[in-house]
Amino acid sequence: MGNRIVIIGAGGHGKVVCDAILSQNEYVINGFVDANVPVGETVINNYQVIAHQDNLEALKTQVDFFIVAIGNNKIREQVFNLAKTILQPATVIHSSAVIGSEVKIGEGTVVLAYSVINASARVGENVIVNARTVIDHDCIIGNHVHLSIGTMVGSNSTVDDFTTSLIGQKMDSFSKI
């Protein structure tokens, strides 16, 4: 298996996910998948849309990994579940992020610029940890969550599946949302 990746979603979130992938220097971006943009159209950083979601099967020989760059949690879950029947989900961590010891990060999760995930935290599958988010030690973040820019999750807190935080939202230690 190689390191070729496709980004599913060519909107605003796709831009920051693309930047995170480029910062990692781990994957080779083959292009984007987007249901609302014609195949062949150049969209972000001179990458083209190479398929629509309903034609992911055609990418099996061109791409090894995928990452979903769609902000809506429910839609992101649906696309993630479909895509992982065909391709391998990637985990994308921006090079400026800080990841503590014994942290577990699920498949399909994106950790964006200047975020911090402290020791023994667990982050589920297909999660957006947006820029400058802090997840303190021993937190549990569910699946298909979107922690918006600047969210601060205090130690030993739990964030349930499908939760979306507000920009700059703060959760005290031992909280549950």
List the model feature ranges, each with a label.
Residues N30, D64, E107:
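Conserved acidic residues
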Residues T91-I177:
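Structural signal for interior beta-strand "rungs" in well-ordered beta-sheet cores
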Residues V37-V98:
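Phosphate-bearing ligand-interacting subdomains
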Residues M1-I44, I50, E57-K60:
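Hydrophobic, well-ordered beta-alpha structural blocks that scaffold small-molecule cofactor pockets
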